[in-house]
């Protein structure tokens, strides 16, 4: 099959001689963005087309002026640019994540963006699209990546918290997607205690709740306003933080913390932190 209307350029995936790009890494006139992670969603484009959730995530991360113009495109809403018919389909990756489905010259090409086929209670599930060409991300495509059952891992975390009431658990999570999925799965598995958040996680969690994802009782993981010594207050508590904070002095303020990572990848032997939750 000859395809001459889409190609890879230094900016990213270029469609119809630059009429628009998908997830470009350099500023362009018109960009369709699959989701809000920084390696796909960059500031500086003139016109950004994405789901409302992705646009709000970009606004939260980059400020109101992250682009000159933005257009909300709902899932399965039709859009035509230079004779290319376009719609977005759920990708199951994070809130608002989408596949870009393009139809031109009797050819259907789907750009997956990052996607996930496992259940995730915080975003719309991945939707298979019949395509002539499927341009896929392959972050975890190698056979070495074997993910255990997510609910099993969540219950192991809950059991660990219950087994060590004199210690706190500090789990490293990425601020967009991983944090909210972990929290929601904990709630769905019966853990309704307050979860304490590093400051860098708060805004995106609030944004998820704005879009109807109930994350339960969340509080900042501060030490200044606690009624008792932080060492005593945080015993038996669960704290979520970005991975970088686990090796920082920030995590040492807590009582003999058990450190872990909520990761989509495997635990390699050279890692110093255990992967408690592979979700």
Residue ranges and their predicted role:
Residues 2-16, 21-26, 30, 38-168, ...:
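His/Asp/Glu-rich metal-coordinating catalytic cores
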Residues 25, 173-176, 198-199, 240-245, ...:
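Structural motif
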Residues 34, 269:
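Conserved adenylation A10 loop of the ANL superfamily
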Residues 37, 126-128, 185-190, 212-213, ...:
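Short, solvent-exposed amphipathic alpha-helical segments in soluble enzyme
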Residues 133, 167-170, 194, 236-238, ...:
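Residue-level preference for the first positions of well-ordered beta-strands
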Residues 157-167, 173-180, 184-222, 229:
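Hard-cation-handling environments
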Residues 207-263:
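A contiguous, basic/glycine-rich beta-loop/short-helix subdomain that forms a polymer-engagement track
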Residues 270-279:
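Single conserved hydrophobic/aromatic residue that forms the stacking wall/gate
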